[in-house]
């Protein structure tokens, strides 16, 4: 299995591979699980192998060589291929070409692509499938055709109206490594209406579809004329480059002959260079003329696209303004103004509702009630700022100014003043430690106590608090 790109997980399991390499039963009805198990293994593996190897067509003999393991080839590949052909996964190359070429293809495609493909089939094999008969894989061919189209649209060659066969092969060299694969891809693109193929003066010319266009247009005389001009410009550029190199060579030879003292040969070289310079000038003028024509063609193509865009814009604008006239617009504006005026009149009418049915006496009565309620609210006592003291001997009552006795107030005020004096006469908080005598209960020393001989500080004693 040297040609196989990757081994499946079961490839190293001899017992499993012995089963998969064995021949199929005569019919699927004999053993359904046996038949389906082999098909689920071989069909995906064949397609994966073809994609990895870049194969657009395969044959029975090729698969038997590629899947050979330990000197043995799978015995059921013919049945697998027949099942793939029944599903449409594989098709005979001859049937594929005939089916694709039966519709829109031009005579040029039949001559340039189909005939070489049919020639590669070889001798007639009859109704039986030969071991070397090519079998194409339509799914992979479509994938390669999409890649070729993408490659063209992203390359500088997209600016050219037509491509030669050599340019197409160079463009698709990595995608289609051999002529047979390229012919299959071109056939698929032709069937999808993505390219046109034409032979002119023994040269095969291919026209690709433009970007953002669904189908390719047929090759026109304008395309052929632009192609000829571009080929002429290319030829003139090559001749100019060759003439410039020849002029440099003659100049160098003239210097060499002059140093060698051969003045006659030096003058001869200069004479040839002068004639060559005239030729270079003529070639340059021709190239400028061709380039000017190509530039005008490009400008005309741009103008054509601009005019086409203008025309599409006018058509869109015309469609947008369909059934819209000046009279209709003025009528609509008048209707809008009329309905706006009507709305203003309605709003003004609704805002001027009469209040004659409202009784003035009822309003005055309601006003007097409001004023009386306000006076009652003003006569209420102030809200107490402190907590309400509730006496346990009698229910809680709100006191008024008439219930308060002046003598009681004076007595309460004297009590407050006496309490303040008592607070003022309290001794200061001792700043040092409290000295406790062991012979008597602890006492706070008063202000009249003598100075302590130990530290010279005064201590004050107060009566010891009594717990009640």
UniProtKB/Swiss-Prot annotation:
Residues of the region (Disordered) are 428-468
- The organism encoding this protein is Xenopus tropicalis (Western clawed frog)
Coiled-coil parts of chain: 233-303, 353-379
Pfam families named in the record = Snf7, WHD_CHMP7
Q: What is the lineage of its organism?
A: Eukaryota, Metazoa, Chordata, Craniata, Vertebrata
Function according to Swiss-Prot or TrEMBL: ESCRT-III-like protein required to recruit the ESCRT-III complex to the nuclear envelope during late anaphase. Together with SPAST, the ESCRT-III complex promotes nuclear envelope sealing and mitotic spindle disassembly during late anaphase. Plays a role in the endosomal sorting pathway.
Q: What is its main location?
A: cytoplasm
Keyword terms of this UniProt record:
Coiled coil, Cytoplasm, Nucleus, Protein transport, Transport
Family, per entry: Belongs to the SNF7 family.
GO cellular component entries = ESCRT III complex; nuclear envelope
* An annotated GO BP: protein transport
Q: Any idea what this protein is called?
A: Charged multivesicular body protein 7
User: Keyword tRNA processing: yes or no?
Assistant: no
Q: Which domain of life is it from?
A: Eukaryota
